[in-house]
Amino acid sequence: MKVRPSVKPICEKCKIIRREGKVMVICENPKHKQKQG
């Protein structure tokens, strides 16, 4: 899980979702998981 100021999809399988007011990227590849912080 990477925490960064701006989250971007890295590959075509990355999905941007909102959870508890935070923007997150979820993906099949665990390296692509990101959270805005």
From Swiss-Prot:
Belongs to the bacterial ribosomal protein bL36 family. GO terms for molecular function: structural constituent of ribosome. GO terms for biological process: translation. It comes from the Bacteria. The keyword Cytoplasm does not apply. This is Large ribosomal subunit protein bL36. InterPro entries: Ribosomal_bL36 (IPR000473), Ribosomal_bL36_sp (IPR035977). Keywords: Ribonucleoprotein, Ribosomal protein. The gene is rpmJ. GO terms for cellular component: cytoplasm; ribonucleoprotein complex; ribosome. Pfam families: Ribosomal_L36 (PF00444). Transmembrane segments: none annotated.
